Amino acid sequence: AVYLLRKYKYGWMPATIMLICVLGTYQSYISIAIGLMLAGMIVDLIKGKKADKVIRSGFLCVGILVGAVVVYMLLSHVIYPNLDNESYGGVGNMGQIEISQVPTLIGRCYKRFLEYFLWKPFAFVTKTSQTMNILVCILAVALFAYLVWKKRLYRKWMELTLCIMLCGFMPLAVAFIYFMAPEVDYSMLMFYGYTLIYVLVLAMADICMAEWEQNSGIGLKKWTEYSRYGLVIVTAVVVFISCYTDYLVTNKAYLRMDIAVSRVNNYFNRIIASVEAQDDYQNGDDVTFV
């Protein structure tokens, strides 16, 4: 959806339809779409796109997102008339967030994002994964600062201000599921959008490499050239290790959950088998556990 929106003049039409399907498939995926939109605008500004054009693109993205959400909610109530009575995950209260809750929910998004990457990740997150996430954040800031200097973005105050604002919105975008589901415990939510932080870091490293290749004919000191590619290698290694540790953590967590569920099922099967083995037990009798 985001690709079509950025690539074609009338790409907003299929993009809107796709985003409606995205919401219908799994609401957590919308965070990825919002994050990709923001990341694309950040990259555009770094590459030299004018602020007014990026602002127009931003308004178009907001309009598409709002339209997709509204249509999705209407279709949800048509397809599932009893949706308002559904209690699972707070689905029945979808779209009923009070204005007074908005600042708190926005703060919740930033808090959970910072906790995951910097302060206090989940208990199952390993020390290696936490360290790599901290390094990813440091690299993101370092690469952004370098590109602002290299691209002379500090001379264009409108573009620089807008770029910093969009970077500030990035945590809100990738953690937007915390805003959408205020009644659900944070440990039960899926935050796929967090992976876009790694993608954004790699995108900035890619811009750096393109800039260096363009100026490769200019005489450079050896240490400068080595430090450049050393930065790229470090970025690639850190992002790879972060993704790999996330892969391990996720699979181990689901494996532990599967083992726990199997044990509970086996335990209750033994209890039921023991009850049914009683001489005076009749099929359909009420059983009370004390």
Indicate residue ranges for each PLM-predicted region.
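Membrane-embedded, lumen/periplasm-facing catalytic core of multi-pass transferases
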Residues: 238-290
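Perimembrane helix-loop-helix junctions
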Residues: 33-66
